[in-house]
Amino acid sequence: MMWGSLFNLFNTVNAAQATSPKPQPRPAQSASQTMQTITVYDAHKNPKTLENMLAKGGEGSVYAVQGRSDVLVKLYHPEVLNKLQPHLQQKITAMLNNKPNTANLLSWPLIDVYNQQQQWIGYAMHRKQGLKLQFLAHAVLYKKHFPHFNRRDIVLVLLSLIEQVQSLHRQQIMIGDYNLNNFLCDPKSKTISFIDCDSYQCQFNGQFFACPVGSPDLTPPEHQNKSFKEVVRNSQSEVFSLAIILFK
């Protein structure tokens, strides 16, 4: 199933409803931490205080920034930095230098973040608001979090998702891991924001960065039984994953 088929399908439903610094290879240490606050620095050694930990995953943790409600910081776990440096920093730096056209709808890296020793430990990003798309796919949570949504509203949300994925594809950026928790829906505007973008497969000026994560149940047959970090996604394999979540 390609883009034309997906758009035709949703347009049909919609119409029916309308009528009815350089990488440093040495291991990085943790950010300066006192009690429950963490201090990090930009490339010019300007400090910023982090507050509440909002999320924690296998690669790192996401924190709020004191005095900046619109910005979040992701700090990678020390063991991740020790294992993946300098490649990880190279990828984030490439993303910083190649912002997509729809960066305003993405938690795309804004600046590099360092510890007190000026070792790279993560990045800052815009904070996106919305409800997880997982709620919209859940029969019970859907009614709780989207009580006024009808089928036409759902179609508008999914069309927003499709259009943004297609825009990224035109820029050689593949989502890779179609986790519904990484898409946030604004119930009012019916638009989708993307978070956890640092795992995306990207290609910038001849540099290729794979997406090292994914879900087997959303992976096309030709990519099964392979390490995700060795898989090269393309628009066809992406549409396979996208089609599955559209009908969840």
Which positions does each model-derived feature cover?
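Conserved structural core of kinase catalytic domains
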Residues: L105-V157
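Activation segment/activation loop of eukaryotic-type protein kinase catalytic domains
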Residues: N179-Q224
